[in-house]
Amino acid sequence: MEAARRDSIDFFLGATTPAGFKGYFEPLRREPGMQMYLIKSGPGCGKSTLMKRLARAAEQRGELTQRIHCASDPDSLDGVILPGQHRAIVDATAPHVVEPDAPGADEVVVSLYHTIDAEKLHQCTDEVKALFARNALLRSRAARYIASAGSLLLDSRRTEACSANFDKVRRYVKRLCTRVMPRTEGIGSEELRLLSAVTPKGEVFYQGTAQALADKFIVFRDDYGAVSRLLLELIRAEALTRGYHIITCPCAMHPEDKIDHILIPELKLAFLTDNRWHPVHLPSVQAVRCTRFLDRENLAAYRARLRFNERAAAELLEQASALMAQAKSCHDELETYYRAAVDFGKVDEAAAECMEMFGLK
């Protein structure tokens, strides 16, 4: 594994959620002025290596570089984003297929299919198709475990919500934002990224990204998510209204309706949610225990149910990660067939062309 540097900016741009695979490649495409470079190739054909090479070159030049990791294999990259250039290069193959809307204008297709000896690979058709099918089966089973865990965690969040004083939350956010986010003349804007995901290694949380982009941390400790959900939703609205560019990080388990973290690089400020799934361990944080917004006596009546949900969800996610690890092993075997049929000299030539397109040669 390529070790993440202390100041490395790492995200996911897609993950398996209770609703299936959720990707943020389309929102990335819609970011103002963004030009996308779409890599097309097979497994094990050098896509991630090409992007790692580009990321290293950009970082050596001092460019702000976002590394986008693959949730199915966090050691591999699904993309690299250079915000200063308004450019991104991404793996545009399944499960996050991206096709050009305006080829050459908004998107450039970087095809590596010409590097594959199709005749050689054709000799292994049965083995390759069987591995693709087994990989899909294992990923589908993992998704069902994640869906079951998500159902329990949602039940816990709704249970906590019945004991929450949301008016108190709203008043708190108004005071907090007045103190830490002065109004600006700018127009608010937003990037969508994931800071955590369920992976073959368990739940991976890129806490170092917050450290790279901020030096002030407001951390909401919330075991079940009902209070932090509203806190982050209101903070997002305030930040955009006050004219800031923000990086919004949805919850990997419920990305459609829950935000876990918000980063405001301009203020060097991060709002983070701390819980069992992504514990925050940072020095000098302003810690806010969300129990202050709860009727704890009322919530205590549901303690056994909440504990059961947490234990069961943890076991389900552990099984999901184990299945994802099996899927990764299957994918690794699949890559051996492709690697044997790839001309990596041609891949190196394509990588050099990409470096030139990004002005990094």
Give the ranges of each region predicted by the language model.
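N-terminal pre-Walker A segment at the start of P-loop NTPase domains
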Residues: 1-28, 167-210
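Conserved nucleotide-sensing/catalytic segment adjacent to the nucleotide-binding pocket
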Residues: 2-21, 56-120, 126-127, 239-318
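N-terminal accessory targeting/assembly segments
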Residues: 2-61, 218
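N-terminal low-complexity, Ser/Thr/acidic repeat segments characteristic of secreted
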Residues: 7, 35, 182-186, 216, ...
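Glycine-rich phosphate-binding P-loop
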Residues: 36-55, 202-207, 212-239
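A cross-family "folded-core" feature that marks the main globular domain of proteins
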Residues: 39-40, 50-51, 58, 66-69, ...
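Generic recognition of cysteine residues
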Residues: 45, 70, 124, 162, ...
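An accessory alpha-helical subdomain
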Residues: 127-179, 308, 312-357
